Amino acid sequence: MYTRNLLWLVSLVSAAPLYAADVPTNTPLAPQQVFRYNNHSDPGTLDPQKVEENTAAQIVLDLFEGLVWMDGEGQVQPAQAERWEIMDGGRRYIFHLRSGLQCSDGQPLTAEDFVLGWQRAVDPKTASPFAGYLAQAHINNAAAIVAGKADVTSLGVKATDDRTLEVTLEQPVPWFTTMLAWPTLFPVPHHVIAKHGDSWSKPENMVYNGAFVLDQWVVNEKITARKNPKYRDAQHTVLQQVEYLALDNSVTGYNRYRAGEVDLTWVPAQQIPAIEKSLPGELRIIPRLNSEYYNFNLEKPPFNDVRVRRALYLTVDRQLIARKVLGLRTPATTLTPPEVKGFSATTFDELQKPMSERVAMAKALLKQAGYDASHPLRFELFYNKYDLHEKTAIALSSEWKKWLGAQVTLRTMEWKTYLDARRAGDFMLSRQS
């Protein structure tokens, strides 16, 4: 299989392996099977239970593997589990692990590694950003454990032997197996955590069960991973190495692609016509299930006042941001993308009104909250460093100044420090997705 250079309008972050392939007989391979991917920024962590963003998930999906994976058609496929049974009307699942599973250090991977991973996810001490994910899956006692009302050992998951994992749900969840492909429900090596504790996720201590292992981490530059010979499907892992580059500017990514230094990168929608002419056949436009939004800090003025929050909500020109600023995006009125199977989006009548009416409503709300031309609304808009995020922030601040007279200060940080500040509540209005 040749490593082919591709440009993507958006990054496809899925639970599907990007490295496995069935190579036809006599197919010539490229001399070096190295894949260089623009991942935009350094991940906040590589601990599966602490992952909260796509930049980390993309790497963790290559370093670790769960019970199942999702193929390109969105279908659940066996991964660490070779098969499973569903019992008690969908309230109990029995997963049978493959024989001979190993961690990257050669130690056996067992059902207990899954139990530990899932217990870590709901343990308040872990502070997993996806702790609620297990409660949403209705795993027995997950919600109570997250709330601090039950012990982690009461979680509805147990190892009946080294190769058998039993999961008990509080109610049937038809899509439960699809949820297992997300890193929060990946296994972690109990023998490594027993030795290193919270320091297990430092690069020098980590042990993996996925197709690749961490080889090098140059902060804010790149992460390099190499093929894991202990991986269950190593014979089909064609790539020998993957490089995840922290290029936080789409133009830089594109220029390095043109220079042959990157194999896959994002490009701004505005550049598509020119790229289709200059690089025919190399551009892929792929839909992505993702919603970008801004999060209010409700514990700080002025956003502890619902009238202020509604005023900003009403005066966001979603069409402008989606079509003109970013391009090829769909204006969002809900957090859940409308393409999600079985989801019916709610129509909010007030967002269907002309902008002039929405502005009048917003101004009235701000006046009630004590803001006017002599006392304008002032706040800080916080986003992680990336050129498209900056364009969005500038557009929003300009719109709010034009419609409401708001004085908006822009603040940006590198991804890791941005996450730390957001977790600490050090923001007023912050970008999320």
Predicted feature locations:
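A structural "hinge/loop" feature
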Residues: 41-57, 80-81, 107, 129-130, ...
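Ligand/substrate-recognition segments at binding pockets and active sites
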Residues: 37, 219, 359, 363-433
